Amino acid sequence: MAAFIKDSFWGQIIYRLSGRKLFRHNDELPDYVVPEKYLLDPKEEVLNSSDKSQSSENKEQTEGDQATIQNEPASEHIIVTWDGDDDPENPYNWPFAWKAIAAMQIGFLTVSVYMASAIYTPGVEEIMNQFNINSTLATLPLTMFVIGYGIGPLFWSPLSENSRIGRTPLYIITLFIFFILQIPTALSNHIAGLSVLRVIAGFFAAPALSTGGASYGDFIAMHYYSIALGVWSIFAVAGPSIGPLIGAAVINRSHDADGWRWSFWFMAILSGVCFIVLSFSLPETYGKTLLRRKAERLRKLTGNNRIISEGELEDGHKTTSQVVSSLLWRPLEITMLEPVVFLIDIYIALVYSIMYLIFESVPIVYAGIHHFTLVEMGATYVSTIIGIIIGGAIYLPTVYYKFTKKLLAGQNVTPEVFLPPAIFGAICMPIGVFIFGWTSSPDINWFVPLIGMALFAVGAFIIFQTLFNYMAVSFKVEYLASVFSSNAFFRSVSAGAFPLFGRALYNNLSIDKFPVGWGSSILGFISLGMIAIPVFFYLNGPKLRARSKYAY
């Protein structure tokens, strides 16, 4: 764990405050041998290489050197890379246990902030009574939080890929602000103030959502990345699913009209614990940031200012207009010009929105029809977690045999390998919605609608995973942050807006004994139509990629 603390948020601060004496790296230890390339003047190296030929032995040594030299007169840099393929400071070379610990920490962060969206739901009735407002206004803080973490990725995703910043400082600083915001939120006495605080909290919760999956890719090889992304997504989807149960439990335990406030006190405690743990133990994982720090250390060690990292070169050449473009314009441009991104954004936004509408309909079914207590009603949301686990049990082996195993065997794999499972998930989702809607009746056992919720979760999870991976392997790496940030924006804004009219949708279409039947049917029929999207990609994917300037 000492290695983790060394590259953690506080570890880096202590390192610098101690004058680089504490938490030193391998290249700062007395027995470290500086590679010869870092000691040479690039001009001298260019002259030497042009004046005399090298033996085959020297060529092999040059190919194995840990720095590549750009011979252009304009650059004359020594580019820092890892000390060999087995450099222990390269996150890809971490032992499995280290990778598992880092993955669990990022998963803990994701759950800790992501459950804040739906933990608010059980307190809606109390807020309506206390503030004397209707259900639409009472739902507004939920909407604002979701919209907040939809806007956040447009800003945070590009910053996380700047070598000067990296992943961990962004996680820790925004997590601290998120933690602080829970205090005034819990003390709020007006729905407007509550809504404003929630949208700000959602904005600062966004890095876990927008960058968590990318962090897994920093230390997990491409062959296994699809599986790792599936594991991270279980954390991401489990957060909103267990939020209502925890919210119901803390509200019920408070025994007063202000019980809803305890949802936010709980979030303050949880995010505070998460901040303390991760700020001391979550290491930096972004390779370009780690190499930038290494370049700084080598410049100090050797006095050679020509030593530079790839990240420093990239960031130094970006103009203000390029930064603004990557932050705001490129995600919009890709969404408008790429049919794949546009259609997947619409589909994922629908899936996300239906999930939050189902969360809104649960009180109608289980409090209104079956007369469940607040905690009993909160427990019904566990069915979505069960569905997610089942979806993962289907998806993970499938992607291993259809994608990972073939890559390990050196076979060529096209992105369309993810689409047959996507079609399966697309079929499961509307079936689950119909079952939930038409079995939510006083004449039918309360357990049956939960089967529909679980089946919906199976389909939703598989759709998320397959379509995200389809985009990840279809588009060039330098555009992925924009691709995923546009998707996060679309789905979050849509999911944030849907709950505002969710109650009205169900109430206006309610019939005797089936209060959510026709409302759910509308969602189910729309979902049926959306099955055409993965089918269309399966049939036309190669043609679409061939016409794209952003795709491989």
Curated annotation (Swiss-Prot):
InterPro entries: MFS, MFS_dom, MFS_trans_sf, Multidrug-R. Residues 47-56 have a biased composition (Polar residues). The chain crosses the membrane at residues 100-120, 137-157, 168-188, 194-213, 225-246, 262-282, 346-362, 381-399, 419-439, 445-464, 477-494, 518-539. One of its GO terms (molecular function) is fluconazole transmembrane transporter activity. It is found in: Membrane. The keyword Transport applies. Pfam families: MFS_1. Signal peptide: none annotated. Keywords: Antibiotic resistance, Cycloheximide resistance, Membrane, Transmembrane, Transmembrane helix, Transport. It is a multi-pass membrane protein. The keyword rRNA processing does not apply. GO terms for biological process: response to antibiotic; response to cycloheximide; xenobiotic detoxification by transmembrane export across the plasma membrane. Residues 46-70 are annotated as: Disordered. GO terms for cellular component: plasma membrane. It comes from the Eukaryota. NCBIfam families: 2_A_01_02. Belongs to the major facilitator superfamily. CAR1 family. Probable transporter. Confers resistance to cycloheximide. This is Cycloheximide resistance protein. It comes from Candida maltosa. The lineage of its organism: Eukaryota, Fungi, Dikarya, Ascomycota, Saccharomycotina.
